[in-house]
């Protein structure tokens, strides 16, 4: 039996790009140069996280078991003005057809629609500058270097626009939903009346040999569907996107219908669909409900009628209740899916240079905005993404770095805003993980 598997069509993940390497504070100490200038190199760029569309993947199941991804940081700068090494980017494969959204805002970040297409979803932080960049005529030996910029952190929602590889078609109550529930872990509602399946139910079929494909139980058809009767048009649009059709015909002798007429009616509706002749799709004819007494006689007549009308195809016998014929049918479906995919891949070959990398760009406000919150008497906290990034990139191990940060905060108006909120000398001020005493 195929292994049941839940079909995952959307999931939530977290991505953390790598921090840039820290800039170095260093000085030249060479013979005959006792007063050598600054020689601290820059840190390397942190690794970005990049999605790559891969048409060999069908689901987002890999992201169900691992939801957090972190790229490596860049190397720190070195002495003698040597730059730190940039970190390698982290590439994550996703199925073609994956759309990426910001989990909290719902903003669409990108849509991966071509095999090999890349999307940068979290950009690595730039390396901090070493003290070779901060020498001036006034301060020829600066003890100032920047820490590496933090890598972008994002919470993402991945959504896969599922195109079922195999579509189950046939009149209502021929056993489509039952078959889907047997070969996958999908749990469609099943009942013996028309149009039980109001929308496609999706599942993944995993075969013992490692092959897999997605399968959809589509709404049952009736005569006139191609003209919009019942759920016909919606149904046919779903069929249009499948690779293989499993055409199920009931062998229940008590349903009062002729098996070949049912088969011919469905074929006619598929062929009459105005947007495409769906009857030309690869098809497997399935004689369902073979466990019902009298089904063998009805099957024999069905085969005679097919032959009389020039249909030279094998009919696969199936009982979803007893699982008779399920393994053989699923193996044949996987064979046809592979054949169709090979044909599509050959027809869709494109020069490699046509696939471009897209980068999601976060647009920071031009003005560095911040807010001051009074936590308690003599305690204040300053909020602001860019301000917190500035503090994170400041090397606070050296007095020159601390003084440079103080000057920048004053220039931005932080001191004035703290005074306006009632701050006095000695009050504690917090910016992210950094704290200091306010001085008028």
From Swiss-Prot:
Record-level Gene Ontology MF annotations: GTP binding; GTPase activity; magnesium ion binding
Binding site for Mg(2+): 177, 197
Domain Obg: 5-163
Pfam families, sorted: DUF1967, GTP1_OBG, MMR_HSR1
Superkingdom, taxonomy of origin: Bacteria
Enzyme class name: hydrolase
Domain annotation OCT: ranges: 362-440
Family as reported in the entry's similarity comment: Belongs to the TRAFAC class OBG-HflX-like GTPase superfamily. OBG GTPase family.
Assembly and interaction partners: Monomer.
NCBIfam families xrefs: Obg_CgtA, Obg_CgtA_exten, PRK12296.1, PRK12297.1, PRK12299.1
Listed name of the protein: GTPase Obg
Gene field: obg
